UniProtKB/Swiss-Prot annotation:
TPR repeats (start-end): 15-48, 79-114, 115-148
Protein name per the record: Tetratricopeptide repeat protein 9C
Family: Belongs to the TTC9 family.
Gene name of this polypeptide: ttc9c
Source species, domain of life: Eukaryota
Length: 178
């Protein structure tokens, strides 16, 4: 067991190192390298994630046993890497909104109250023209960070777009059944 604990700690340490290098690249506006490093960190963490292993005994690899501290560190590192990956993808040209949305959902599955993930899920939904979803995520973000100007701005943009969309839909249906 001690040998396995050491291997787990080494894996977490390596993933943390990739994440730190990714953070450095992010602050230096080297988004492509940052994305690559966050991916490497997540790949490193995959080997520890029990949810990815087969529930059938004897089929596929067996799950690694983590102590509570390691499990918490795994969860935090995964959430941080997905959140940072979403931030990079949001700043890429052109922004990759579908991937931002997917990464944000990964964070929210691990940390449902994460304001940055709620905001990014809302922003990406807005740009994907899914205004109902955008409103849902941005409202949650606004309730947790009521003074954040970016969140307020996107809530207003979303409300306007949602209102326009509903009005156009109403006009369309009136024309059909008029």
């Amino acid at each position: 067991m001690a040998e396995q604990t050491g291997a787990v700690d080494q894996c977490l340490l390596q993933a943390s190192s990739f994440k730190s290098q990714g953070n450095k690249c992010y602050t230096e506006h080297r988004m492509r390298q940052a994305v690559s490093l966050y991916h490497k960190a997540l790949l490193q963490l995959r080997s520890l994630d029990a949810s990815l292993y087969s529930p059938l005994p004897g089929v596929g690899p067996t799950a690694v046993k983590l102590n509570s501290q390691q499990a918490e560190e795994l969860k935090t590192l995964q959430a941080d890497c997905y959140n940072n990956l979403a931030a990079c993808l949001l700043q890429s040209q052109p922004p990759r909104y579908q991937r931002v949305y997917e990464c944000s959902l990964q964070v929210l599955s691990l940390q449902p109250e994460n304001v940055k993930a709620l905001y990014r899920a809302g922003v990406s939904s807005y740009h994907l023209k899914d205004y109902t979803n955008a409103h849902h995520y941005l409202s949650q973000a606004a309730s947790r960070a009521p003074k954040d100007g970016n969140i307020k701005r996107y809530v207003q943009l979303t409300d306007t777009a949602l209102s326009t969309f509903r009005e156009e839909e109403k006009q369309r249906y009136q024309g059909m059944f008029g």
